[in-house]
Amino acid sequence: MFSHQDRDRDRKEDGGGDGTEMKSKSRSQPSGLNRVKNLSRKLSAKSRKERKDRDSTDNSSKMSSPGGETSTKQQQELKAQIKIGHYILKETLGVGTFGKVKVGIHETTQYKVAVKILNRQKIKSLDVVGKIRREIQNLSLFRHPHIIRLYQVISTPSDIFMIMEHVSGGELFDYIVKHGRLKTAEARRFFQQIISGVDYCHRHMVVHRDLKPENLLLDEQNNVKIADFGLSNIMTDGDFLRTSCGSPNYAAPEVISGKLYAGPEVDVWSCGVILYALLCGTLPFDDEHVPSLFRKIKSGVFPTPDFLERPIVNLLHHMLCVDPMKRATIKDVIAHEWFQKDLPNYLFPPINESEASIVDIEAVREVTEFQRYHVAEEEVTSALLGDDPHHHLSIAYNLIVDNKRIADETAKLSIEEFYQVTPNKGPGPVHRHPERIAASVSSKITPTLDNTEASGANRNKRAKWHLGIRSQSRPEDIMFEVFRAMKQLDMEWKVLNPYHVIVRRKPDAPAADPPKMSLQLYQVDQRSYLLDFKSLADEESGSASASSSRHASMSMPQKPAGIRGTRTSSMPQAMSMEASIEKMEVHDFSDMSCDVTPPPSPGGAKLSQTMQFFEICAALIGTLAR
Amino acid sequence: MGNNQSGGPDARYGGPNDKAGLRRHRMMSETAKIAGQVLPNPDGGPPMIFDDGNEDKSGECPVVFRWSFTQNAQPRVVHIVGSWDNWQTRIPMVKSTNDFSTIIDLQPGQYEYKFQVDGSWVVDDNQGKAQDVHGNENNMINIQDSDFAVFEALDEDFQSSTAGEVLRGESESTKNHDTPNDRELEKLRSFTQEIPSMDMLRKAAGPPVIPPQLMQVLLNKETPESCDPNVLPEPNHVMLNHMYALSIKDSVMVLSSTQRYRKKFVTTLLYKPV
């Protein structure tokens, strides 16, 4: 354990680039613990007194007596402090681009937090309102031992206060600068914690996109806390991300090239750069000249010092692979032999798949206890049984269940350390990690995307599926023909950009809400283009306003025919159309409800959303072919 | 060094081992509780509070008041008095780098207030002002309900920001660097049947290069003989909802798409004569 200078400092707000970061630090004065405690206790007592006085003053419309007034004024004179919610604001930890970060003390528990104060006018003029909203959305429900916690967000007319976990150990960046390259065991411990946090984010469909040592904080025990989710985004089904964000040294090649990416693969690249920095004390791709830096990143060639062991070099090359399709996935990293060594159990709690279909009654009750969701337990249960896994109540429920597993493992760890029943592990027999067992079992049941083996005979027989439709005309001519065909079919559209259009049939009545689809023209090579058709799910009406931003960003699965509410627990069989045959392939028959064929709803079965999507595609393809 | 996650309690109680043990024990007891448990707190932090700032007082929300000063004219002491309590209490403000500030919990509505700077009554010219019935000038503030709901406040700010204007297509010349999802962009546009001009199509930047993930077609994967032939590989999330097709053969068009269904995925095929 390296001893380092104990600085009481939280991370600085990062404006998305190194150049825009203001480095202004504030260090708390060293003082006796008892004196600090006494002072806090006095302040707390005064705070309670102040509230009592204010309440009595507010309740009374009478003018207080001169003596009483003087007494009140004298008491007021003594209490110059700022309180937001239940927290008393203390010294400033730092000043970022968007506002200050101050220490906050919970008035009853004396617990210390970091309060990030964002001036609304400033974030508006700097054009980062969306960034702040995404950070709050993505971080507020997260509970992981290695992700900084956002306890509360308080909005006022002029400022927004984010009550966050206070971490006193400084940045991992400063730690590396101070210590140089770390020993393998210490680097591995940090890396395991980072990967555990990133895996948690990805499981909940959030990609961080700004992973770097400056955004990794250290607590008193030198554990990592992932911070700054301002560049994070929610991953939705069928959608790609394109924003070129993050710091250049840690950004993946496809990000700096402005290409589309899915999400997790760019976080894997950043983690690879961080792993290299931990082990070598330098960056794999570094150059003062930005164009030269970009060339190095796109080449994927980086120095490998002699002191790096062979397994680590293999892992680094797999993570820092330029081709995102060949790059290591988070699963690959977790399964790697070097990563598995000395891996604590709490970082990857086993997923009990047999319990996936059992509703946790306690978790349902906890969802109802959120003040934001004023719902009954029945509503939560029906949301879980409904066909929309992205319902905001389902999201909250799954987060609580996941958080419980992590908390259970962490509690076990605390118990172990408290009783010191098991000293540090020796080189005992290596037990297979549950993730590995699950992976090996699933590989026997389910083939993987990487399986490229094929027999020649089968290949000759089978026709090949292809995405959308292709053309070798010029892109503007293709889109013009598409618009003309849509007008001919009496469709209407929204133009997001000339090559990305949202389409639907014109509704027969204002109340009708026909399904929508997205048309996007892609370039395949120099002379070939591809028109991609993608189904867009209906947004659920009447969702809670607090969750509307998050809800709108989610892609929803198809709703069963004839029933659009979330209370139904049955899925009627889609009606077969005349002259059309539907074949349904279910990936896993363990969910027997897919095979059940209940009678159609009394109101008359409609086409499923998927079938309606197919009909629109077929009509448009047919018209374009003519 | 063990991976001890109980950093908070240890830091608070410092050296004494018995206190640390007591704290850990209490935390474990709290973790074991069933009734009344809001959320487990592995790090022993404060309980999770999920509100938008509407605390114990009914309808009262925090409002920040500031008195700014320059380095060469720093007041020694600043107080604020206001109509929220009929001008009864002189509230001392806390000095910071560039200002004195305080936070007062108020109901939504309109209020007048004034500052006392080093003993002199002052009105801040940079904040809203109003005259009362006696002809005196005071600062004035109007508090809205939406100021205290975080996402409503952020949505309002977003609409009136440059990014919001750009996304609505109102000012296309301005460049903005806050790039949300296309789904957020879609909510700001309206359906039309107007065909864009060929000129507009030509001026636009070319279509994006197709991502390699989309060229991984689920139904083109060979399944090992040991697997159930109806079971397909697990798709990644970007492959979902897209339409794949076979070439038209024997006058039949075949389309397919994969959607998420609960914790599984479903691939649907349509055979349609043309």
Swiss-Prot record, chain A:
State the tissue distribution: Expressed in the pharynx, the ventral cord, neurons including the hermaphrodite-specific neuron, body wall muscles, the vulva, the excretory canal, and weakly in the intestine.
Species annotation: Caenorhabditis elegans
Q: How is its activity regulated?
A: Activated by phosphorylation.
- What does the record say about PTM? Phosphorylated on Thr-243 in response to oxidative stress and during dauer development. Phosphorylation at Thr-243 is increased in response to sodium azide or the AMP analog AICAR (5-amino-1-(5-phospho-beta-D-ribosyl)imidazole-4-carboxamide).
UniProt xrefs under SUPFAM superfamilies: KA1-like (SSF103243), Protein kinase-like (PK-like) (SSF56112)
Bias class Polar residues marks the residues at 58-77
Q: Where is the composition biased (Low complexity)?
A: 542-555
Superkingdom of this entry's organism?
Eukaryota
Which PROSITE patterns does the UniProt entry name for this protein?
Answer: PROTEIN_KINASE_ATP, PROTEIN_KINASE_DOM, PROTEIN_KINASE_ST
Feature: compositional bias, Basic and acidic residues: 1-24
Biological process annotations from GO: cellular response to glucose starvation; determination of adult lifespan; negative regulation of protein secretion; negative regulation of TORC1 signaling; nematode pharyngeal pumping; positive regulation of autophagy; positive regulation of dauer larval development; positive regulation of protein secretion
Job description of the protein: Acts as a sensor that couples lifespan to information about energy levels and insulin-like signals. Role in motility and response to oxidative stress. Involved in the establishment of germline stem cell (GSC) quiescence during dauer development. Plays a role in axon regrowth after axotomy in PLM neurons. Plays a role in the maintenance of glycogen stores which are necessary for resistance to hyperosmotic stress. Plays a role in the regulation of flp-7 secretion from ASI neurons.
Compositionally biased, Basic residues: which spans?
Answer: 38-49
How is the quaternary structure described?
Tetramer, composed of 2 regulatory (R) and 2 catalytic (C) subunits. In the presence of cAMP it dissociates into 2 active monomeric C subunits and an R dimer that binds four cAMP molecules.
Residues holding ATP: L93, G94, V95, G96, T97, F98, G99, K100, V101, K116
Q: What is this protein called?
A: 5'-AMP-activated protein kinase catalytic subunit alpha-2
> What is one cellular component GO term in this UniProt entry?
cytoplasm
Q: Where is this region: Disordered?
A: 1-77, 541-568
Which residues are named in the active-site annotation?
Answer: D210 (proton acceptor)
Q: What class of enzyme is it?
A: transferase
Keywords, ordered alphabetically: ATP-binding, Kinase, Nucleotide-binding, Phosphoprotein, Serine/threonine-protein kinase, Stress response, Transferase
What SMART domains does its record include?
S_TKc
Where is the organism placed in the taxonomic lineage, from the top? Eukaryota, Metazoa, Ecdysozoa, Nematoda, Chromadorea
The UniProt family comment states: Belongs to the protein kinase superfamily. CAMK Ser/Thr protein kinase family. SNF1 subfamily.
Entry EC no(s): 2.7.11.1
Carrying Phosphothreonine, the residues are T243
Q: Which InterPro entries match?
A: AMPK_C (IPR032270), KA1/Ssp2_C (IPR028375), Kinase-like_dom_sf (IPR011009), PRKAA1/2_AID (IPR049020), Prot_kinase_dom (IPR000719), Protein_kinase_ATP_BS (IPR017441), Ser/Thr_kinase_AS (IPR008271)
